[in-house]
């Protein structure tokens, strides 16, 4: 299979995986290690055609079990006047032409999953600014992997996955970056997939894409 196909398929592995990570109630506790799940999933989808990729991803989501939905709760939040104008665009989950009907249906249903129990990978903390307390995401559930100074292909892409999705869902200024954040993901999948590339150099380069000075 071509490198272009592998990068394209890996992109959907990352965007679908990120959506599942922050929306599926299965990640309210430590029953599942999503990093392990993703690294195991990657070779199954990396060289597959779109239809097979979509089927594998849909079955992967099913593997996390049943859950309750609370559509009214989240619709009320999304229609509130206090909702940030530049919130994450998740319209792509309804793209049946790209994702196929079954995968799209699973992602759309996850949007309304009851997440009352929270998420093990991100919590909300507060910091004081201008005499008021403002919410801030805290990613204290993420594993640091201090011993992986030169990780293999799977964990290199996991780095891209984790950072890109953190920014996608929790960094309100991503729309101000010089480069469209949607373009950053495929670029760094390609960069990290290159065996001759420096892992630390590419990681620093990716972080610098935030232009957060």
Which residue stretches match the model-derived regions?
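Flexible, low-complexity junctional segments that flank or bridge functional domains
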Residues: 1-213
């Amino acid at each position: 299979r071509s490198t272009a196909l592998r990068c394209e398929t890996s992109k959907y592995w990352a965007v679908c995986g990120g959506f599942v990570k922050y929306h599926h109630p299965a990640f309210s506790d430590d029953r599942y290690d999503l990093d392990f799940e993703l690294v195991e999933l990657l070779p199954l989808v990396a060289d597959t055609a779109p239809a097979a990729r979509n089927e594998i991803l849909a079955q992967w989501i099913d593997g996390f079990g049943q859950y309750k939905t609370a559509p009214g709760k989240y619709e009320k939040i999304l229609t509130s006047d206090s909702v940030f104008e530049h919130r994450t665009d998740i319209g792509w989950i309804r793209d049946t032409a790209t994702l196929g009907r079954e995968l799209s249906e699973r992602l759309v249903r996850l949007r309304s999953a009851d997440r009352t129990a929270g998420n093990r990978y991100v919590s909300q903390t507060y910091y004081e600014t201008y005499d008021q307390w403002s919410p801030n995401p805290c990613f204290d559930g993420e594993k640091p992997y201090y011993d992986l100074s030169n990780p293999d292909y799977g964990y290199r892409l996991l780095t891209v996955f984790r950072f890109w999705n953190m920014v996608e869902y929790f960094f309100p200024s991503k729309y101000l970056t010089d480069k469209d954040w949607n373009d950053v993901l495929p670029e760094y999948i390609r960069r990290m997939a290159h065996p001759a590339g420096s892992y630390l150099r590419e990681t620093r380069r990716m972080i610098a894409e935030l232009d957060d000075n």
